[in-house]
């Protein structure tokens, strides 16, 4: 009966997964097995009394059993849908024995595990078996193995479900069925070579079957007896049965059947301890449709093994919360208007403001028709503590009444005209006039002493009569002063002309300078040139050929000849020549720095000091040079006294070549000559217009001319140089008179750069220097 109940439960669990044909064939086979198993036992009393040793059936009974078993043997193998075996020996056999002696060894064992049920031990097995007769036990020796859907076994790929029948009793004893079951997604151990055959205690099974058959009310055997022995028994898990709406349902989800092997090769259990069933089974009513002679029992309740503790259930991690949605920033609203500005609670208030006792109230601007007739208002007096502001000056054209008394501490402005009747000490000299160190040995010139009349004429407010004769006299004096200054080749400053010669005629100094230029051009053939517009520096150059002025018959003729050679070296080296290059060219001429020349003197001082001071050369440091290096360039005076074209012609004449042989230098010199012609034409036009406006004509050069009134004392100590000796002034007189008659004696010619008075020694000296100094020019 237990076998029938087990087979029926297995059928209900398998019908959900098997096909229709397999289900029909399985039902037919099970019904035949049930009919055979319901045969009356031969000796029930003996089987119940002696569970350890069962009596074999007679020969006739054995023959009947063999015939029935042969007829009921199934021929088809079933395989659970989507099940996978992982071992070569995973064969599920449902066999039937013919020998009564082998019946105890072929007791069927079915292990079931409910769906999603948790096993509580590897050794907990539920056996629902009932002892039957010898024929029944012998006939019902088939074991059915079912596996849940998608369950996986690790027995091998050749696992099949066979319903076999043994024809020999001995073969039946050795054909012990092996039905491993395993739950979904669980794994069983692969069988090994030393797997032992299953041994079932015949006595215990016979006794328990006999008790269940005779007395349906007897409770189920204890869990300890239901467990298999340690020598290789299988662990079976039986799913609990529930009655829902009067129908018996059974869910097979996880069936674990583990084939037992030797003690050394068996896998260790997952949990410690052994599983034991409850001591008192609970019985329930038979479900509808169950046979009346079958006692329906509920599965034994599981108890926790010794030492077992509930494990903390794995908590589901909290769902990840999505970040809060980004909020739209608030729209910009109108800015809050400033309602209440900060107001000082206690502003500082002057309690007693200073009040002038007699404030001067300005009535408004008053236009006085006659400022000279200004009279004090009646009753007006100067305040006693009144002082003039430190930087205050009166209007330039305002004069007070003739009887206006000046305060005793009233400061006079620096340009205030002195009264005409103020007496001057006999030895009074202005503080800004230069005094030489040996001024005690010098006799001051009467022209240097200011006269009362000259001081009175400096009054800008007084109407100055335009005396042409007086202006021409100052212009002639300025001509002599310029020629004296230019004799030393030092540029002349405008401030020096105003201080030394023009003096009180500062308001008409442009006319005096223009008259002096007219005299220089018409009488001496010299032109006054302003070479620096910022510092207002002037030089004198000869017209129309400046080179004649450079190579004139003066005491500096050798120096100016050397200067012409130096200008050529600079021009042919790209308008600049380093100090090393220039000294190398001079060494080839026999001139060495540090060696004093009989005509030129100290060469280094001549090049780096005298020529630089006279603005013939420009001596400067090379930028970013370490150690410092210096180079030479053309000075401002050189551009006006000569030109690049004249220097290039001089070099070509010395080497007997054409100036156009040096194309780059010739084009540069030609461009400069054209620019100079344009500038000279514009300047000549401006001067002609100014002279017409001022009324300057040929009468300016008429009349006697004398050099006796030249004031040598106007030269400074540095400018005098060789003029410290009075006898050295004689060459200047000759030089001035030479220029006075130069225009009438020498015609204007452009024959070449070497132009001088009748082929004098200056031309020959420059030519000799050039022949030696320009041999390197190619």
From Swiss-Prot:
Modified residues (Phosphotyrosine): 92
Family matches, as InterPro entries: MAGE, MAGE_WH1, MAGE_WH2, MHD_dom
Highest taxon above the source species: Eukaryota
Bias kind Pro residues: ranges: 398-412
Residue ranges, compositional bias (Polar residues): 104-118, 185-211, 225-240, 253-263, 300-319
GO molecular function: identical protein binding; transcription coactivator activity
Sequence repeats: 296-301, 302-307, 308-313, 332-337, 338-343, 344-349, 350-355, 356-361, 362-367, 368-373, 374-379, 380-385, 386-391, 392-397, 398-403, 404-409, 410-415, 416-421, 422-427, 428-432, 433-438, 439-444
Keywords: Biological rhythms, Cell membrane, Cytoplasm, Membrane, Nucleus, Phosphoprotein, Repeat, Tumor antigen, Ubl conjugation pathway
PANTHER family (alphabetical): MELANOMA-ASSOCIATED ANTIGEN D1, MELANOMA-ASSOCIATED ANTIGEN MAGE ANTIGEN
Known function: Involved in the apoptotic response after nerve growth factor (NGF) binding in neuronal cells. Inhibits cell cycle progression, and facilitates NGFR-mediated apoptosis. May act as a regulator of the function of DLX family members. May enhance ubiquitin ligase activity of RING-type zinc finger-containing E3 ubiquitin-protein ligases. Proposed to act through recruitment and/or stabilization of the Ubl-conjugating enzyme (E2) at the E3:substrate complex. Plays a role in the circadian rhythm regulation.
Name this polypeptide is given: Melanoma-associated antigen D1
């Amino acid at each position: 009966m237990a076998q029938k109940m087990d087979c029926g439960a297995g059928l209900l669990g398998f019908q959900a997964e098997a096909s229709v044909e397999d289900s029909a064939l399985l039902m037919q086979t099970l019904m035949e097995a049930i009919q055979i198993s319901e045969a009356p036992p031969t000796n029930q009393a003996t089987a119940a009394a002696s569970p350890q040793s069962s009596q074999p059936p007679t020969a006739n009974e054995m023959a009947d059993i063999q015939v029935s078993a042969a007829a009921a043997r199934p021929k088809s193998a079933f395989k659970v849908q989507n099940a996978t075996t992982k071992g070569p020996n995973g064969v599920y056999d449902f066999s039937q024995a013919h020998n009564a002696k082998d019946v105890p060894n072929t007791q069927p064992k079915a292990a079931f595990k409910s769906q999603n049920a948790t096993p509580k031990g590897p050794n907990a097995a539920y056996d629902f078996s009932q002892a039957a007769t010898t024929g029944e036990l012998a006939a019902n020796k088939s074991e059915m193995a079912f596996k849940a859907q998608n369950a996986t076994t690790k027995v091998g790929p050749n696992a099949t479900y066979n319903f076999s029948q043994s024809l020999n009793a001995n073969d039946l004893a050795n054909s012990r069925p092996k039905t491993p079951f395993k739950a979904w997604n669980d794994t069983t151990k692969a069988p090994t070579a030393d797997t032992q055959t299953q041994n079932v205690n015949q006595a215990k099974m016979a006794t328990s079957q006999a008790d269940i058959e005779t007395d349906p009310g007897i409770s189920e055997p204890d869990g300890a007896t239901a467990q298999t022995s340690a020598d290789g028994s299988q662990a079976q898990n039986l799913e609990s049965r529930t009655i829902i709406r009067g129908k018996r349902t059974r869910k097979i989800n996880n069936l674990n059947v583990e084939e037992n092997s030797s003690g050394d090769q068996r896998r260790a259990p997952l949990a410690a301890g052994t599983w034991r069933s409850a001591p008192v089974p609970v019985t329930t009513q038979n479900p509808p449709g169950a046979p009346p002679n079958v006692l329906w029992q509920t599965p034994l309740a599981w108890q926790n093994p010794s030492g077992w503790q509930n494990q903390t259930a794995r908590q589901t991690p909290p769902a990840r919360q999505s970040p809060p949605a980004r909020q739209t920033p608030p729209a910009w609203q109108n800015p809050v208007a400033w309602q209440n500005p900060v107001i000082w609670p206690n502003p500082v208030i002057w309690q007693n403001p200073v009040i002038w006792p007699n404030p001067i109230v300005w009535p408004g601007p008053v236009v006085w028709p006659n400022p000279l007739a200004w009279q004090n208002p009646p009753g007006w007096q100067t305040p006693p503590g009144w002082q003039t502001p430190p930087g205050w000056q009166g209007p330039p054209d305002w004069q007070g009444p003739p009887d206006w008394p000046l305060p005793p501490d009233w400061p006079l402005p620096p340009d205030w005209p002195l009264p005409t009747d103020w007496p001057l000490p006999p030895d009074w000299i202005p503080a800004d006039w230069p005094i030489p160190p040996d001024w005690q040995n010098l006799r001051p010139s009467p022209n240097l002493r200011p006269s009362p009349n000259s001081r009175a004429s400096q009054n800008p407010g007084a109407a100055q009569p335009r005396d042409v004769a007086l202006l021409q006299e100052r212009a002639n004096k300025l001509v002599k002063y310029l020629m004296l200054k230019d004799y030393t080749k030092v540029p002349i400053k405008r401030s020096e002309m105003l201080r030394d010669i023009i003096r009180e005629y500062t308001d008409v100094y442009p006319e005096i300078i223009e008259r002096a230029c007219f005299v220089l051009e018409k009488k001496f053939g010299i032109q006054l040139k302003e070479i620096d517009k910022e510092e207002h520096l002037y030089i004198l150059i000869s017209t129309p050929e400046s080179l004649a002025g450079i190579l004139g018959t003066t005491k500096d003729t050798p120096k100016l000849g050397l200067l012409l050679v130096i200008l050529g070296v600079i021009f042919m080296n790209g308008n600049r020549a380093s100090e090393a290059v220039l000294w190398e060219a001079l060494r080839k001429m026999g001139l060495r720095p540090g060696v004093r020349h009989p005509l030129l003197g100290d060469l280094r001082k001549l090049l780096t000091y005298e020529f630089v001071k006279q603005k013939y050369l420009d001596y400067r440091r090379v930028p970013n040079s370490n150690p410092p290096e210096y180079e030479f360039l053309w000075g401002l005076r050189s551009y006006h006294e000569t030109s690049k074209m004249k220097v290039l012609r001089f070099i070509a004449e010395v080497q007997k070549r054409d100036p156009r042989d040096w194309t780059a230098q010739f084009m540069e010199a030609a461009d400069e000559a054209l620019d100079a012609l344009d500038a000279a034409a514009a300047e000549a036009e401006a001067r002609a217009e100014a002279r017409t406006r001022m009324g300057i004509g040929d009468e300016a050069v008429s009349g006697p001319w004398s050099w006796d009134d030249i004031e040598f004392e106007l030269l400074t100590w540095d400018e005098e140089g060789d003029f410290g000796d009075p006898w050295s002034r004689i060459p200047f007189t000759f030089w001035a008179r030479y220029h006075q008659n130069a225009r009438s004696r020498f015609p204007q010619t452009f024959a070449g750069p070497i132009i001088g008075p009748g082929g004098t020694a200056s031309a020959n000296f420059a030519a000799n220097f050039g022949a030696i100094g320009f041999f390197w020019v190619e």
